[in-house]
């Protein structure tokens, strides 16, 4: 076949065009793959990368027996990339609003932002995050996704709420120990730079940078969750019986200063702290200033005895009134008691007798002893908001001021200061520093530091302390504190009823009182000091002897069983500890869970029958009578939970 010159020219032209196109394509491909690759990657990632800062878990707070009081759990948080949302913001808001805390209007506003990352809801409840995840899948919603975050969880609800405090969304402690120990408990920050696909899901292997530090240290408290539960349950009953505005209880070991329980009412659940009020958050056992009233009389009496200004057998002829600086002080019943000694003055809380003792001792000596007891200064406990208290300047005190202070008026103290002072009386005059942190542990669970018991003073000699303790035992067994008496045990204590201070206008609030009782025991070998304060009772009596002393009895009658103390009888012999007639009836909560009682002292059959009735699995260890249990009294357990109880003959 012959090819003409024109045909050759056309073929040559076509080849040249194809070669040019090939060169252009190869050149462009080379530019894209080699020269412009890094620039394109940067542009692409700048559109879809997400810079996330996630908090690693806080350390756990345990009670003295290793029971968790505050812990961190993994939850899911919902975020959005508004640039990837295909549906209208209002449509997306309509879908997810029922399951998130953000309102529809705020969701719409967030989804209209010119950004690649906005939070929609942090630390969601599991059922709600599952519901949203299902909606995302069913409705093919793009641009919504979850990230795991650590959330603070309080497994016992409101137990020790004011002591523990709470943590904000950004893992910052906002109250209580969570705030004070924030640096110790807080973990580090996890930072991730993540590339995502068009649906907002992280692309596998696209984490550009990641730093995952260790979680925070753990803290063990001196608090005993079982004793805390006993105290709070007693307070709940007291609030119901009295209709009081506030109430508080402190339980302390006088030999170590360890706080075993600290409870307040009203209260709140730190899992839902946003539902609480400022009143609910107050740890009034530490922060509240009040006039101690008659509970202060043993402090004055001990100062008079220790200084030698008053003798134990010294007689005062009480005529029912005491005059000072033109004012007349009377007894609570307006009557005189005739010839009385110190034991009678304290036992029957005789105001006139205390005024005589105080003024005989003098302002300087009394003030010195009162300050040696720690009044007027903080205890230094590891809790926020502690008050100093208010005392007279001895140089400015009149005879009336001395008489007034001698009956616990004209000064202001905190409940914790009173517990510290009575701890000294119970502990042979040796005063311990109250503390609530027992130890710190690292992430491996190794104890790194402990809080050792610390003697902070000896305000009175041991002999004086024993004398006052014996007198206070008579106050409970024979005097005004008989409603605090627990049959078979020797407890010492003092009742108090004081008018409330008017902090705005000065003076006192008419008809408003703080009723209190503070005691310790057993007197022979004190294991605990217990203070009960009831603020502004609205129902029934206003007197500490009538409404605070029974709360003390309620608490210590359970404590002697918890400590397995054998009662003492008057002839000095002892009898074996026995439980109540029968275990409390099983009471199920709405979800079928039950609160475990204290099984100690009950027979194998009694414990078995109770657990079977409660729908729980009985795992006995031994036979005879119960001596201990793995799950502590007060633990809330679900149906079918194995309950381990140890028995012995």
Which functions belong to the PLM regions below?
Residues 1-273, 364-376, 484-487, 504-506, ...:
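Periplasmic/cell-envelope proteins involved in peptidoglycan metabolism and beta-lactam response
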Residues 2, 70, 197-208, 249, ...:
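Beta-lactam-recognizing serine transpeptidase/beta-lactamase-like catalytic domain environment
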Residues 17, 121-127, 131-133, 147-162, ...:
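Conserved SxxK-family serine transpeptidase/carboxypeptidase catalytic domain
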Residues 56, 86-90, 122-126, 171-175, ...:
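Soluble non-cytosolic domains of exported or imported proteins
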Residues 220-222, 317, 459, 595, ...:
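Generic structural detector for well-ordered beta-strands
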Residues 585, 637-649:
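Conserved "repeat-terminator" motif of extracellular CCP/Sushi domains
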Residues 618-638:
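BRCT (BRCA1 C-terminal) domain core and associated BRCT-interaction motifs
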């Amino acid at each position: 076949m012959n090819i003409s010159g024109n045909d050759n020219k056309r073929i040559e032209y076509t080849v040249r065009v194809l070669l040019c196109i090939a060169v252009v394509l190869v050149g462009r491909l080379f530019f894209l793959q080699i020269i412009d690759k890094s620039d394109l990657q940067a542009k692409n990632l700048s559109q879809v990368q997400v810079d996330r800062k996630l908090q690693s878990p806080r350390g756990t707070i345990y009670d003295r027996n290793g029971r968790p009081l505050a812990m961190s759990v993994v939850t899911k948080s919902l975020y959005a990339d508004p640039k990837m949302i295909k549906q209208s913001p209002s449509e997306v808001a309509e879908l997810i609003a029922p399951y998130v805390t953000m309102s529809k209007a705020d969701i719409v506003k967030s989804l209209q932002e010119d950004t690649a990352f906005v939070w929609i809801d942090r630390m969601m409840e599991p059922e709600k995050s599952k519901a949203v995840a299902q909606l995302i899948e069913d409705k093919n919603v793009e641009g919504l996704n979850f990230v795991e975050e650590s959330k603070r969880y309080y497994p016992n609800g409101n137990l020790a709420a004011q002591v523990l405090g709470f943590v904000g969304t950004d893992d910052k402690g906002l109250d209580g120990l969570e705030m004070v120990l924030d640096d110790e408990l807080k973990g580090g920050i996890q930072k991730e730079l993540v590339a995502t696909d068009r649906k907002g899901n992280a692309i596998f292997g696209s984490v550009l940078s990641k730093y995952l530090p260790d979680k925070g240290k753990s803290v063990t408290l001196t608090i005993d969750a079982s004793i805390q539960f006993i105290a709070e349950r007693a307070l709940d009953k007291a609030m119901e019986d009295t209709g009081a505005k506030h109430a508080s209880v402190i339980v302390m070991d006088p030999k170590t200063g360890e706080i075993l329980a600290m409870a307040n009412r009203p209260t709140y659940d730190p899992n839902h702290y946003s539902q609480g009020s400022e009143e609910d958050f107050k740890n009034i056992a530490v922060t509240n200033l009040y006039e101690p009233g008659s509970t202060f009389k043993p402090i004055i009496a001990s100062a008079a005895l220790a200084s030698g200004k008053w003798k134990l057998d010294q007689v005062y002829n009480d005529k029912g009134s005491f005059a000072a600086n033109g004012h007349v002080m009377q007894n609570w019943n307006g009557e005189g008691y005739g010839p009385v000694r110190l034991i009678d003055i304290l036992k029957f809380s005789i105001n006139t007798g205390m005024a005589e003792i105080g003024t005989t001792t003098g302002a300087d000596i009394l003030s010195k002893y009162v300050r040696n007891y720690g009044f007027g200064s903080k205890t230094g406990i590891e809790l926020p908001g502690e008050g100093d208290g208010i005392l007279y300047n001895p140089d400015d005190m009149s005879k009336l001021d001395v008489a007034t202070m001698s009956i616990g008026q004209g000064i202001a103290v905190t409940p914790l200061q009173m517990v510290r002072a009575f701890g000294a009386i119970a502990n042979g005059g040796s005063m311990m520093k109250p503390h609530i942190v027992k130890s710190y542990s690292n992430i491996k669970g190794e104890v790194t530091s402990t809080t050792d018991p610390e003697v902070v003073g000896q305000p009175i000699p041991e002999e004086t302390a024993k004398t006052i303790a014996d007198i206070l035992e008579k106050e409970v067994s024979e005097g005004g504190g008989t409603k605090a008496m627990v049959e078979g045990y020797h407890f010492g204590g003092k009742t108090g009823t004081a008018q409330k201070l008017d902090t705005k206008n000065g003076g006192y609030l008419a008809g408003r009182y703080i009723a209190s009782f503070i005691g310790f025991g057993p007197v022979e070998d004190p294991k605990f000091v217990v203070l009960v304060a009831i603020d502004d009772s609205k129902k029934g009596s206003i007197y500490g002897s009538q409404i605070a002393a029974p709360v003390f009895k309620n608490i210590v009658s359970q404590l002697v069983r918890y400590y397995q103390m054998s009662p003492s009888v008057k002839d000095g012999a002892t009898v074996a500890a026995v439980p109540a007639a029968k275990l409390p009836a099983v009471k199920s909560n709405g979800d079928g869970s039950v609160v475990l009682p204290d099984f100690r002292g009950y027979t194998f059959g009694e414990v078995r029958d109770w657990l079977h009735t409660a729908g729980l699995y009985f795992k006995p260890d031994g036979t005879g009578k119960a001596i201990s249990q793995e799950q502590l009294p007060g633990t809330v357990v679900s149906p079918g939970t194995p309950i381990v109880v140890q028995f012995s003959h």
